[in-house]
Amino acid sequence: MIYRLSEYDENRAIGYYQIPVLKPCYYVPEQIIGFNYVKSWRKARDGIGVHFFLDDYQFERMWITPHRQIERLKDFSCVFTPDFSLFLDMPRAMKIWNVYRSRLIGQIMQDVGLKVIPTLSWGEEETFEFCFEGLEPGGVFTVSTRGVVRNKKAQGIWKTGMDFAIEKLKPKCILCYGVRIDYDFRDTEVKYFDARKCN
């Protein structure tokens, strides 16, 4: 088990679960690609962001060797925080652990000068007490709609969580990865990225 305790700073963590805090980011990328394409990407990197809306095994190395992976990310205009899974059937302890890991990696990336956009992810309502911890209001956030639109239960959970996120975080802009969803984002600016074109 890798804990990354040498990277953790209790003075930059918040709440009962001591989740690392991220500074807000106001950058909006023109295009995004998956982390799994970073190593082979040969095109221009200006205006390009890197997302982690992938199976966890494809970016677990961000936790195992973060500094080595960050070297490959430095030339991109921004990076999203890792989207570690928060499946409904996972024990709560694992969900908290995955939120902690995502924030800590985001903090490490910010410390070396990367523009970091927090990824919003949540499960059932009981997860709201920790899923949005460590995020300061007013910046740009990203979220995925994959697997949500065609599943009524998942769509309900997504909308409830997004309601909570907008109320708590008051985003300047939300970057949505996936298909458009029937949801009122109110006064929040929204930019969609088609998952089929984010390679």
Task: Name the predicted role of every residue range.
Residues 1-25, 187-199:
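C-terminal accessory extensions appended to soluble enzyme cores
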Residues 24-41:
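N-terminal accessory interaction module
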Residues 39-45, 49, 54, 62-199:
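Eukaryote-skewed repeat-based solenoidal scaffolds used as protein-protein interaction platforms
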